[in-house]
Amino acid sequence: MTPFNNEKYIRIQSEHIKERIAQFGNKLYLELGGKLFDDYHASRVLPGFQPDSKLTMLTQLRDTMEIVIVISAADIEKNKVRQDLGITYDVDVLRLREEFMNRGFLVNSVVITHYSGQASAQNYSQRLERLGIKTYFHYTIEGYPHNVALIDSADGFGKNDYIETTRPLVVVTAPGPGSGKMAVCLSQLYNEHQRGNQAGYAKFETFPVWNLPLKHPVNKAYEAATADLNDVNMIDPYHLEAYGKTAVSYNRDSEIFPVLDALFTGIYGHNPYKSPTDMGVNMVGFCIEDDAACQEASKQEIIRRYYHALNDFANGDISEAVVNRIGRLFQQVGISTADRKTTTAANERKERNSAMAVAAIELHDGTIITAESSPLLGSSAALLLNATKYLAGIDHDVKLIPQEMIEPIQHTKISYLRGRNPRLHTDEVLVALSVLSLHDENCRKTLEALPELAGCQVHSTVMLSEVDRKIFRKLGIELTCDPVRK
């Protein structure tokens, strides 16, 4: 049994969405918060939740739904990158569309939001049109979301393109937060109403989990994940007032609810929801079967997020306030960086050997393996060799890649490719192992052990190169680094 019951989730979540569609006369715009697939955050804090669980769940509704993908013109303009995949949002829109269509979902359109005539957005729209993808523009509305009189008018939502949809359920998704998904849904409600069509709105967000305690580590891990957005979990005051029951929401939903109340009243003549919690359809909290395991997984996620923030701050990508925001969560859930075993192991070896670059990995059986840089190998490359040798049952002292093979590679890197670091990176070590595996049984065994590294934890005492980061990401390894440059 896993801590999270994924089968139960898929069943009861799809049933609940069907009920909400029926509530609004068989037309529902469902704003999807977070990721529809590749939801690795959810799979880390809720062990047993699969990265594509939400997509699998929606497969139950596939014949009655279509997907609209949203991207902000501002994100196109600044080439915003999805950090977990290392690709820009505009590229991810095409990836998402292809993934959805490969799974049999209908994807008819892309909406470019926050549009105010940006040339980059126009060029992107033309590119999509050449690919046969219908594109719509939704414009920047002055005073949004608080200028309700303007928003709920022909000069507000009324000037947005009306998205042609054909199915009862319209799922509105995006590559990342801040894309304008809610505004797209509300704009559609306004324009459907103008055309005499009945339609409803609901919000499908996994986090925060409304029926877990406010300070539950699962909910605190969500705060860590959205620290750059300044999201803060809070008790839903509207739900408490309406029902006398506590439910967890977050600041942005509570802040915007009076605006939504006015918009819904303008569109419907009344607000069908009494609270932000009412708008949601999330059933995740009913599917947790081992709360202690989910709490521990969430605490580890907060530590990882803290290290990621330290690295981003060192690179100048975020403010120190974001780092401090995550740091304050440590006291709230009772953790420290020492609770990450690989961090302790790597730093202990660093101090013991007076080494600069040390890396440590925790394998699934609890074994901790460490490695440090040498004249031949970087610490990450050495760690990969040590870990796969252990998993393959090969003695630690066995040399898999002979020095006479490494040295010519180093010579090429420095003399011909104008590199400054002669040490082999993880990708170069894997290529060398692949070549040697044709005639060396041990090399073949180490390569075959690579899939066993998925989900393992690694910590480095220095910030790694992008090459090594990508290899760890592709192997499914959870990496953290001290904010120290080599």
Describe the function of each predicted region.
Residues 399-419:
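Active-site pocket-lining segment
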Residues 395:
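Long C-terminal interaction/binding lobes of large macromolecular proteins
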Residues 176-177:
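The conserved Walker
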Residues 184:
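Hydrophobic positions on the alpha1 helix immediately C-terminal to the Walker A/P-loop
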Residues 372-373:
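Short clusters of small/polar residues that mark proteolytic maturation junctions
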Residues 1-172, 188-349, 353-356, 363-365, ...:
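Flexible phosphate-sensing "switch/lid" loops adjacent to ATP/NTP-binding sites
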Residues 376-392:
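A short, polar/charged loop-to-alpha-helix boundary motif
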